[in-house]
C-alpha cells in the first residue's frame, strides 16, 4: 500500500515538475494587427488579400480615419486579382451605389459573375436571379464577362472589347488605367484599332504617362494598317503643324482625312468637307464639300448635320428647302449643337 502511495506521489511530483517547467516558458506574444502602411506596401506588390484587408480597414476607423472611396479602390484592386471576397464586396458597392461608387447594375452583376465562377454560393444565387428577373442586364454583363475571360487568356479581340467597356461610354464605370492595360494586350497582338486607341492615350496622357515616342510608333503602325482613327490623327497633326514644324501641310492632311473618310469615319468626312469648302490641300468645290458633309451627317456627326441644315436653309450650294433644313437642324440640336438650336429658333 505504501508503495502505491509512493508511486502516486512520484507521479504527481513528476507532473507538477512538468507543469512547473512549462510555466517558465515565455508565452508567445500575440501578433500585432498589420498597419495600413504595411498592407499598402503588400497591395502595391500585387498581394490581393492585403488589398482586400486594407479596403476593410478603410471602411472603418481601424488604423486611421475611415475613407470609403479609398476602400472601394482597394477592393477593385483585389477583385481584378481574382480575390473572391473583394469581388462580392465590390459588387455590393455597385449594386447599392456605396462609397461614392456610381450605381451600376451591369457592373455589379459582372463582379458577381466572377465571384460565382470562383465558387461563391451567394454570387451564384444572385446571378441566377438576374438571369430570370433582369435578362437585359444579365445579357450585357455576360457579354462583358465573356470578353474579360477571353482577355485573361491572351485574346486580342477579347482584350479590345473589354477595354472598350472601361472607356468613356462603356457599360462599366470609366477606368482609363485598366483600359490601357487591356489595350496593351490587344496592341501586342497587332490589332490596329487597339494600337490606335492606345497610341492616342499615350499622346494625350490619358490613363498612362504621356509618351510621344510610344504614341507615334503605335499610331504609325495603326495608320499604315488602315485604321481610320490613326489616319485621322495624322491628318489633324499635318493640318495643325506649328511654324516651327514647317507649318500646316494641307496636302498631307487631306490625304489622311480622305483615307479615314473612305472607311466611314464621320469626323474625317466632316473635315474633308471643310477642306473642300476652303480649297485646302485640294481643289475648292462646294458640291464635293456638301457631299462630304452629307455623308458625315448621315453618320450622326452633329457639326455636319448643322452645316447641311444651314445649307438647305440659306440655299448655299444647294436648292433652298426649309423642310430639309429643319430636319437636319433638329438632328444636330438633338446631338447637342447649340448653333443648330439657335437657327431652329430663327426658322420658327
Q: What feature does the model see in each segment?
A:
Residues 53-60, 89-96, 126-133, 161-168, ...:
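Hydrophobic face of amphipathic alpha-helices that form TPR/SEL1-like repeat modules
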Residues 1-10:
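N-terminal Sec-pathway targeting helices
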Residues 84-109, 270-278, 283-339:
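Ankyrin-repeat and related helical/solenoid repeat scaffolds used for protein-protein interactions
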Residues 112, 116, 123-128, 322-347:
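Leucine-rich solenoid repeat scaffolds
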Amino acid at each position: 500500500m505504501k508503495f502505491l502511495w509512493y508511486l502516486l506521489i512520484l507521479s504527481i511530483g513528476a507532473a507538477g515538475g512538468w507543469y512547473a517547467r512549462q510555466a517558465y516558458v515565455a508565452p508567445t506574444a500575440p501578433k500585432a494587427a498589420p498597419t495600413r502602411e504595411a498592407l499598402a506596401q503588400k497591395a502595391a506588390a500585387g498581394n490581393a488579400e492585403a488589398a482586400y484587408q486594407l479596403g476593410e480597414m478603410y471602411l472603418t476607423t481601424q488604423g486611421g480615419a475611415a475613407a470609403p472611396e479609398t476602400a472601394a479602390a482597394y477592393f477593385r484592386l483585389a477583385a481584378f486579382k481574382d480575390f473572391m471576397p473583394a469581388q462580392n464586396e465590390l459588387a455590393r458597392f455597385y449594386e447599392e451605389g456605396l462609397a461614392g461608387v456610381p450605381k451600376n447594375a451591369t457592373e455589379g452583376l459582372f463582379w458577381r459573375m466572377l465571384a460565382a465562377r470562383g465558387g461563391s454560393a451567394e454570387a451564384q444565387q444572385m446571378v441566377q436571379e438576374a438571369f430570370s428577373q433582369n435578362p437585359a442586364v444579365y445579357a450585357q454583363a455576360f457579354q462583358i464577362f465573356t470578353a474579360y475571360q477571353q482577355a485573361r487568356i491572351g485574346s486580342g479581340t477579347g482584350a479590345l472589347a473589354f477595354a472598350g467597356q472601361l472607356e468613356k461610354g462603356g457599360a462599366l464605370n470609366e477606368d482609363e488605367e485598366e483600359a490601357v492595360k487591356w489595350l496593351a494586350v490587344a496592341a501586342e497582338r497587332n490589332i490596329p484599332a487597339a494600337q490606335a486607341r492606345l497610341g492616342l492615350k499615350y499622346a494625350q496622357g490619358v490613363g498612362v504617362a504621356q509618351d510621344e515616342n510610344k504614341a507615334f510608333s503605335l499610331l504609325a503602325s495603326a495608320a499604315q494598317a488602315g485604321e481610320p482613327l490613326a489616319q485621322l490623327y495624322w491628318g489633324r497633326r499635318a493640318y495643325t503643324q506649328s511654324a516651327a514644324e514647317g507649318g500646316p501641310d494641307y496636302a498631307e492632311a487631306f490625304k489622311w482625312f480622305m483615307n479615314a473618310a473612305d472607311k466611314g469615319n464621320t469626323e474625317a468626312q466632316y473635315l474633308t468637307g471643310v477642306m473642300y469648302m476652303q480649297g485646302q490641300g485640294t481643289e475648292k468645290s462646294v458640291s464635293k464639300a456638301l457631299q462630304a458633309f452629307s455623308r458625315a451627317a448621315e453618320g450622326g456627326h452633329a457639326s455636319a448635320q448643322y452645316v447641311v441644315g444651314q445649307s438647305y436653309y440659306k440655299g448655299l450650294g444647294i436648292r433652298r428647302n426649309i423642310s430639309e433644313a429643319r430636319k437636319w437642324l433638329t438632328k444636330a440640336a438633338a446631338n447637342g449643337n447649340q448653333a443648330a438650336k439657335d437657327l431652329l429658333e430663327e426658322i420658327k
